[in-house]
């Protein structure tokens, strides 16, 4: 999956794998990491950062982690008013070559309600076109929707991004255990974090305590990795 987004300073993309340019290669003939304007008007090597990424004619100050398999998951933290998930949906609908085929993306909105985006190379469907999302967004596996919806909508205190990530990974091992984290206050992007099982257990226990008493979560197994 690839979404081109911009945090106002840097383009936070690991690499683009859904677009190919045969003329952008290294001395061994292998493709170089690069970014491309959505209308294909400009192409930049990954080492270049002095340009302004545009999504559907506007800046979207956001974070995402981009992976090249369906099992990678992403986070977006929207920072300013006016930049909402609708603009991402419109972008995806008009630039479908940026999307993985037959993928489902889970969105947690500012009210901790989950919504599902479905995309193929033929269409982009969304049931979320209302207010901007200000809370962390997780893109992941579609089968997580029902359970996570119960968890997030019954939380007495909203989960923070790290708790959301670890909870999702604990319930759905297919999401893996590594992730990227961007600190909005410091602007520091830490790549490929792999927490210890002890830290994961501690985070999960803290998150579960936030869940309202009317919801009885199942025990969360943490697989030793």
Name every feature range the model reports, one short phrase each:
Residues 100-121, 172-188, 192:
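Conserved phosphate-donor
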Residues 1-103, 127-166, 179, 190-224:
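Conserved short S/T/G-enriched processing/targeting/catalytic segments and their helical context
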Residues 17-20, 114, 121-124:
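Short, surface-exposed beta-strand-loop junctions and turns on beta-sheet-rich folds
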